[in-house]
Curated annotation (Swiss-Prot):
ATPase subunit of a proteasome-like degradation complex; this subunit has chaperone activity. The binding of ATP and its subsequent hydrolysis by HslU are essential for unfolding of protein substrates subsequently hydrolyzed by HslV. HslU recognizes the N-terminal part of its protein substrates and unfolds these before they are guided to HslV for hydrolysis. It comes from Methylococcus capsulatus (strain ATCC 33009 / NCIMB 11132 / Bath). NCBIfam families: hslU, PRK05201.1. ATP binds at V18, G60, V61, G62, K63, T64, E65, D253, E318, R390. A double ring-shaped homohexamer of HslV is capped on each side by a ring-shaped HslU homohexamer. The assembly of the HslU/HslV complex is dependent on binding of ATP. HAMAP family: HslU. Belongs to the ClpX chaperone family. HslU subfamily. PANTHER family: ATP-DEPENDENT CLP PROTEASE ATP-BINDING SUBUNIT CLPX-LIKE, MITOCHONDRIAL-RELATED, ATP-DEPENDENT PROTEASE ATPASE SUBUNIT HSLU. It comes from the Bacteria. This is ATP-dependent protease ATPase subunit HslU.
Length: 440
């Protein structure tokens, strides 16, 4: 679990997302409250439930990006899902309980990676010994281990560590790969399919087979195999279940797309039906997974939606009450676009410059060009559909199309994009509303 303070979390988000201070503060406080709850005594801790967040704002203003960055900061089981992927229980499609199963899988993977990192050096040493056994078997008069190496084995060990034997082929015994069986289960029977898959995989458990590999590939394969032997899978499962129940975070995107349409009177299995199924999940229920039962009482749900065709009040009242914290994200202005093009650590202009640098082309953007690109993007958004910061991708691709095409032939040159270049390539398109609607 992350121990960062809300101020530190907002500072990290500021490196990648421009503006939207209110949304950043809300998610930062929610993330910090996970840590605060863990410090509270046991009887009261169980009574403290997370306050779920609903982020409302037009497309392209940073809702999904906040989720992506939060996943890296959380250091807790985290999953991002689209509400539109699910259908009501009993109909063809995925039911909402699969969210918790996927979250548990993410927790297993996260904890396994952490444990594997702890035994990395031991696994590397064990893999090295097995490769050396294939290259120079132990003589009966020499003891196993580095200190008891024969002179020939010591020489091969030095060459192996220097990388001189990377391309040499050796034969090693490795665990047989499990049988790959993909079982498509009907909705509600995913647990049965996973049990059947485990059954097929257990047929080959403990079996080995001889493979001929290059030393480089053998070291990598054996390191993974040795690390797998050193970590306790049962302990990982127990820790993952606990981490999901106490610190799990679910980011539910496109929530507005499952609002019921007023002009539609039939059964809406992928809209209101999904909302009804989400209710117990968000409120707190028990979900069966292949790792055990998961209680969802303390899982934090962060939902987001553009709500341009629907309103938050179009959600069923019970679900509205499950998201007590409402945050509105602001539409982006031309000044925001300027900041997006320059301020983030991996700004769009820096990305394009780095891509063209691989061809030997030095690309620079003048301040006047950045201001003009931002202004054109904002104007096109205002006149056509407002797609937020995603408009910058479209405009920059169009602007740099010619340079990108000819870059391989212009190696060693420097190109500076100024306002005149922008107007020459985009000015007429931006002014023509019909053209900009289809091209920009």
């Amino acid at each position: 679990m992350s121990q960062m303070t809300p101020r530190e979390i907002v500072h990290e988000l500021d490196k990648h997302i421009v503006g939207q201070a209110e949304a950043k503060r809300a998610v930062a406080i929610a993330l910090r409250n996970r840590w605060r709850r863990a410090q509270v005594g046991a009887p009261l801790r169980d009574e403290i439930t997370p306050k779920n967040i609903l982020m409302i704002g037009p497309t392209g203003v940073g809702k999904t990006e906040i989720a992506r960055r939060l996943a890296r900061l959380a250091n807790a089981p985290f999953i991002k899902v689209e509400a539109t992927k699910f259908t009501e229980v009993g109909y063809v499609g995925r039911d909402v309980e699969s969210i918790i199963r996927d979250l548990t899988d993410a927790a297993i993977k996260m904890i396994r990676q952490t444990e594997t990192a702890k035994v990395q050096s031991r696994a590397e040493a064990a893999a090295e010994e097995r490769v050396l056994d294939a290259l120079v078997p132990h003589a009966s008069t020499w003891n196993a281990g580095e200190e008891g190496d024969s002179p020939a084995r010591q020489k091969f060990r030095q060459k192996l560590r220097a990388g001189e034997l990377n391309d040499k082929e050796i034969e090693i015994d490795v665990s047989a790969a499990p049988i790959g069986v993909e079982i498509m289960a009907p909705p509600g029977l995913e647990e049965m399919s996973s049990q059947l898959q485990n059954l097929f995989q257990n047929f080959q458990a403990g079996r080995t087979r001889t493979r001929k590999l290059r030393v480089r590939d053998a070291l990598k394969l054996l390191k993974e195999e040795e690390a797998g032997k050193m970590i306790n899978e049962e302990e990982i499962k127990l820790r993952a279940v606990h981490a999901v129940e106490q610190n799990g975070i679910v980011f539910l995107d496109e929530l507005d797309k499952i609002c019921k349409r007023a002009d539609y009177g039939g059964p809406d299995v992928s809209r209101e039906g999904v909302q009804r199924d989400l209710l117990p999940l968000v409120e707190g229920c028990t979900v069966s997974t292949k790792y055990g039962t998961i209680r969802t009482d303390h899982i934090l749900f962060i939902a987001s939606g553009a709500f341009h065709l629907a309103k938050p009040s179009d959600l069923i009242p019970e679900l509205q009450g499950r998201f007590p914290i409402r945050v509105e994200l602001n539409p982006l202005s031309a000044d925001d676009f300027v900041r997006i093009l320059t301020e983030p650590d991996a700004s769009l202009t820096a990305q394009y410059a780095a891509l063209l640098a691989t061809e030997g082309v030095n690309l620079e953007f003048a301040d006047s060009a950045i201001r003009r690109i931002a202004q054109i993007s904002w104007e096109v958004n205002e006149r056509t559909e407002n797609i937020g910061a995603r408009r910058l991708h479209t405009v920059l691709e169009r602007l740099l199309e010619e340079i990108s095409f000819d870059a391989a032939d212009r190696s060693g040159t420097s190109i500076t994009i100024d306002a005149g270049y922008v107007d020459a390539h985009l000015g007429s398109l931006a002014l023509d509303e019909d053209l900009s609607r289809y091209i920009l």
